[in-house]
Amino acid sequence: MGQPALTVMQQMRENMDNYVWKNIKNLDELENVRMSAMRLFLSDYEQGKAEKRYIFHELPNRLPFEDGTFDIGLSSHFLLMYTVLGYDFHIQAITEMLRVCKEIRIFPIVDLDANKSDMITDVINYFSSRYHVEIRETQYEFQKGDNKLLVIKHYE
C-alpha cells in the first residue's frame, strides 16, 4: 500500500481543482476512505480466496462462468479509462463481459486525464447493432464532468 498510495495522493494534490469535493470533503478524508477500504479488503482476502469469493482473472480471456450467469456486471475505473490497452482489447473484454452478464455498466467513461474517452464513440457504434446501448447520467461525480456511465445490455 505504501509507495503507490503516496504517489496517487501526490497526483491528487497536484490536480485538486479537477475534483468535486462534495461527498468527500478533502484529501485527508479521501486518503482515510481509500486506506480503510484497502485494509478491509486485505483483511478478508485470504478467507475470501479460500471460499472462492475472489477469483483471479485477466480480461479479455474467457471467464469461468456460463453464458448469462449474471444480471449485471460492472467495470469500475478500468475499461475505457486505459486507452493504451487498445481498441481490440476493449472490444474483446466487453464482449466477454456481455457473454456472462445480461447487462454491463462501465464507469467512468473518461480517460486518466478526465477527458471523454477517445474510444467511446467507436465502442458504442460497435455494440449498438446487437445490444441496447446508452449513456446514463449518474448523481455521483468525483472528477469534474465524470458523472456518466455506459450501459450495454442484451435485447429482451
Per-region residue spans from a language model:
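Class I S-adenosyl-L-methionine-dependent methyltransferase module
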Residues: 1-53
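Conserved SAM-binding strand-loop segment of SAM-dependent methyltransferases
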Residues: 50-64
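Hydrophobic/aromatic beta-strand patches that form the interior of the parallel beta-sheet core
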Residues: 55-57, 105, 134
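A short acidic, Gly/Pro-enriched loop at the edge of an enzyme's catalytic core
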Residues: 60-74
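Residues lining the SAM
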Residues: 76-79
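A short, conserved alpha-helix within the catalytic core of class I
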Residues: 82-96
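Conserved beta-strand signature within the Rossmann-like core of class I S-adenosyl-L-methionine
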Residues: 93, 97-110
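Class I S-adenosyl-L-methionine
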Residues: 112-156
